[in-house]
Amino acid sequence: MAIQKVSNKDLSRKDKRRFNIESKVNKIYQNFYSERDNQYKDRLTALQTDLTSLHQGDNGQYARQVRDLEEERDLELVRLRLFEEYRVSRSGIEFQEDIEKAKAEHEKLIKLCKERLYSSIEQKIKKLQEERLLMDVANVHSYAMNYSRPQYQKNTRSHTVSGWDSSSNEYGRDTANESATDTGAGNDRRTLRRRNASKDTRGNNNNQDESDFQTGNGSGSNGHGSRQGSQFPHFNNLTYKSGMNSDSDFLQGINEGTDLYAFLFGEKNPKDNANGNEKKKNRGAQRYSTKTAPPLQSLKPDEVTEDISLIRELTGQPPAPFRLRSD
């Protein structure tokens, strides 16, 4: 019985609460329904007032919002302007940096090209100097005169091969080219070439001087004896020391070859001048007081190159660093 009483009491409380809520809702509904027209009229009046104020520009809230939007717009425009100016200035700075970088690279490239060009030129100069040194050495070995030898005449060609002696040389020691001349047939062409060049440049008068110089003719058939003594001081001393026998042997060797005598002195009868030369031999060493040695003819670059190649080949050295010209 007690449990039923409690449940009835609880049910009564729930019903009472629900009843109160329903009564409140009904009251609100009735109030709204009764004041519905007034609410709509007030709302419509407020909207019309706002529209009128908006059209007239008297609405403060609307004006404030418009002003805020304008300020925000101006701020964005200023920001955009500053950004454009920044981009323009930055582009100019980057452009100048690119120009400076390009100039630096250009100068660096020019410097590198100059260094390589200078290096190439220096290498070429060094190579040409080496070639010139080799040519000078070849010329010295071919044409230098050694005045320390007590005898002026030197036979570089055998009597059994050609039947006559080659041109005189003042060197007492054989150089590399002289030994090559005695052993190699290729140098015979060079000796003849030098002899022909000397003959073409000096002419008949120089040949007569050479005849006087080699045979010991003091006065000469053309009157050249007055200037022979001073032009060959070294040969004067050497001839004075060597005596008359060497001159006689040399003259006899030349007289044995008629072609050689005609080639050297331009005369076909070597016996005609032999007696006159023997008579004039006893005048002493003063006949060489004024005569100088004939000028040596320089070789052409191709001839020097051939001589150097032949010297290297005979001495067992490697080939020259320069090449022969091919016409």
Curated annotation (Swiss-Prot):
Subcellular location: Nucleus
Sites of Phosphoserine modification: 166, 211
Regions annotated as coiled coil: 61-135
Any GO MF annotation of the entry: histone deacetylase binding
Any single GO BP term: regulation of transcription by RNA polymerase II
Gene Ontology cellular-component annotations: cytosol; nucleus; Rpd3L complex; Rpd3L-Expanded complex; Sin3-type complex
Assigned keywords, A-Z: Chromatin regulator, Coiled coil, Nucleus, Phosphoprotein, Repressor, Transcription, Transcription regulation
Subunit structure: Component of the RPD3C(L) complex composed of at least ASH1, CTI6, DEP1, PHO23, RPD3, RXT2, RXT3, SAP30, SDS3, SIN3, UME1 and UME6.
Function, in words: Component of the RPD3C(L) histone deacetylase complex (HDAC) responsible for the deacetylation of lysine residues on the N-terminal part of the core histones (H2A, H2B, H3 and H4). Histone deacetylation gives a tag for epigenetic repression and plays an important role in transcriptional regulation, cell cycle progression and developmental events. SDS3 is required for the HDAC activity of the complex and for the RPD3-SIN3 association.
Protein name as annotated: Transcriptional regulatory protein SDS3
